[in-house]
A protein has these predicted regions:
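Conserved "HGTGT" condensation-loop signature of ketosynthase/thiolase-family condensing enzymes
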Residues: 1-80, 97-101, 111-207, 214-215, ...
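A basic- and aromatic-enriched beta-loop-alpha substructure that forms the phosphate/nucleotide-
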Residues: 84
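A short, glycine-/small-residue-rich helix N-cap motif at loop->alpha-helix starts
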Residues: 87-88
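Ligand-binding pocket segment of bilobal, Venus flytrap-like solute-binding proteins
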Residues: 212-216, 220-221
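Short helix-loop capping/hinge motifs at secondary-structure junctions, enriched
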Residues: 223-227
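C-terminal membrane-solvent junction of multi-pass transporters and transport-like membrane proteins
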Residues: 331-335
């Protein structure tokens, strides 16, 4: 197996509710041109990028075969081309594994989504089991509501604690020029917002739609050291998925995430996650998920996500700031979010996060999720 895998360049668009003047291909072009410009890399045989890996759903982005635009816009012909029809964190996982296995040295990763093109809930409904779940109109939002109901009732999570998550994320987003929702809110504002799907309120959910893209170039240790003087090393990777049928799992637990985290931590040599990281970027489409995912990641004991947000430890300046970028609650496309978590973590470790910088950050945790009620989980650990 090869040595370490390093992140040598990252880029992201500004995320907007509707990029009406940009095609998916143009968003891909902007971020790939940026990362290739940062490194000076081309697709030259033997000295350039060996492989491209794109993450996204055609059904969410509009045009069929949207990933094929990547070849058009960057000239990636006659190279290995892979596609991940999942959250962008899976593209990072897959790309890094290709390098660790010794198959390639340099990989261009791109995640894209244009949620404004399609009615998202109808697409998610089609993704559900056609025999039982689709017949009752279940989509990802209603699946999340079932999980929120189960989790909050079992673990005693209060509406005020959920609202605190939103308040924190919006406050952090004010320092992120790429975020969609930057307006400050209070606990009372969140609790007064309309019900989206009981018990989830509108302001407790990520805004829909959101359009945008991001890109990363990763490389083997030898190549990474030549391409940048500030590589960010991927130290651990873990992935796990749970049963698609909601009734086959306890929605108040996140066993798939716990397993993915354990795999990543073992690879990275992390024994105490709360003390092992300086910053965490978690994919939370709903407020309750930041608390539940924190439990699965081992940042607090099971059932104590509410106590964690009450403690202030996850605020900027706290023991482990979670989502200094504002997270998904401040506006990210579903397919892009996991890779963008890695982008944000890399910026933190390079000291390039601007007003949202966590001082002295040396180790970071990034997390991606996909599927109904967090069916698929991916964890990436990084250090500078």
């Amino acid at each position: 197996m090869a040595g370490r895998v390093g992140i040598v360049a990252v880029s992201q668009t500004k995320f907007e509710a509707r990029k009406s003047t940009q095609h998916v291909a143009e968003m891909m072009y902007d971020v790939t041109r940026d990362v290739m410009g940062q490194t000076g890399l081309t697709f030259e045989e033997g000295t350039g990028i060996d492989c491209t890996t794109a993450a996204g759903y055609d059904l969410f982005s509009g045009p069929a075969g949207a990933y094929m635009f990547l070849g058009y816009v960057v000239g990636a012909y006659q190279r290995q081309d892979e596609r991940v029809i999942e959250d962008g964190a899976l593209a990072v996982y897959y790309g890094a594994m290709q390098i660790l296995a010794g198959h390639v040295d340099v990989v261009l990763l791109v995640a894209y989504d244009k949620e404004s093109q399609v009615p998202k809930n109808q697409i998610e409904w089609v993704c559900m089991d056609q025999v039982y779940q689709r017949r009752v109109g279940l989509d990802f939002v209603s699946a999340a509501a079932l999980q929120a109901m189960r989790y909050t009732s079992k673990c005693g999570i209060t509406p005020e604690q959920l609202a605190k998550v939103v308040v924190k994320c919006r406050k952090n987003a004010a320092n992120n020029p790429n975020a969609v929702c930057c307006d400050s809110v209070t606990v009372e504002d969140v609790l007064r917002s309309p019900m989206l799907c009981d018990p989830i309120r509108v302001q407790e959910a990520k805004p829909v739609p959101v359009d945008g893209a991001c890109a990363i170039i990763i490389a083997s240790e030898e190549r990474a050291k030549k391409l940048t003087n500030k590589p960010v090393w991927i130290t651990g990777l873990g992935c796990c998925y749970d049963h698609h049928e909601l009734g086959w799992r306890d929605l108040a637990d996140c066993d798939a995430l716990a397993t993915a985290a354990q795999r990543a931590y073992k690879m990275a040599g992390i024994r105490d996650p709360m003390k092992g990281f300086d910053v965490a970027e978690i994919s939370e489409q709903y407020a309750y998920q930041e608390l539940l995912w924190s439990e699965g990641l081992g940042l607090c004991a099971k059932g104590e996500g509410g106590k964690l947000i009450d403690s202030g430890k996850t605020q900027m300046g706290g023991e482990l700031p979670i989502n200094p970028s504002g997270g998904m609650l401040s506006g990210l496309p579903v397919c892009v979010a996991g890779m963008q978590r890695v982008v944000e973590a890399a910026l933190q470790l390079r000291g390039e996060a601007g007003p949202r910088q966590v001082a002295g950050a040396k180790r970071a945790l990034a997390h991606g999720v996909d599927g109904p009620a967090g069916q698929l989980q991916c964890v990436v650990t990084l250090e500078n």
